[in-house]
Amino acid sequence: MISAGVDSSDLAKRGESLIRQSSNRYLTTVRIAFRAKQRRFDDFDGLLEESSVKPVQRAIVELSDEQDQPDLLPG
């Protein structure tokens, strides 16, 4: 999913895509922040492997993947 580091230009493109395709920039920002907070606590609980990727970066990548490939979502 995410390699040891995230390419900053790719991350910027993903973030711009999330904002551009949203109807409400504020809610998109809140979704990213909420997902990042969840990932940070998952890291503290030891549920995820040690990662050099910051929670906000991981949240942007995950939400971007969910937006671009909705058929990958469970359910």
From Swiss-Prot:
Signal peptide: none
GO term, biological process aspect, one: DNA-templated transcription
MF terms in GO: DNA binding; DNA-directed RNA polymerase activity
The reaction(s) this protein catalyses: RNA(n) + a ribonucleoside 5'-triphosphate = RNA(n+1) + diphosphate
InterPro entries xref list: DNA-dir_RNA_pol_omega, Pol_omega/Rpo6/RPB6
EC annotation from Swiss-Prot or TrEMBL: 2.7.7.6
GO CC terms, sorted: DNA-directed RNA polymerase complex
Keywords: DNA-directed RNA polymerase, Nucleotidyltransferase, Transcription, Transferase
Pfam family for this entry, one: RNA_pol_Rpb6
Main function: Promotes RNA polymerase assembly. Latches the N- and C-terminal regions of the beta' subunit thereby facilitating its interaction with the beta and alpha subunits.
Subunit description: In cyanobacteria the RNAP catalytic core is composed of 2 alpha, 1 beta, 1 beta', 1 gamma and 1 omega subunit. When a sigma factor is associated with the core the holoenzyme is formed, which can initiate transcription.
Family: Belongs to the RNA polymerase subunit omega family.
NCBIfam families: PRK00392.2-5
Name this protein carries in UniProt: DNA-directed RNA polymerase subunit omega
Species this chain originates from: Parasynechococcus marenigrum (strain WH8102)
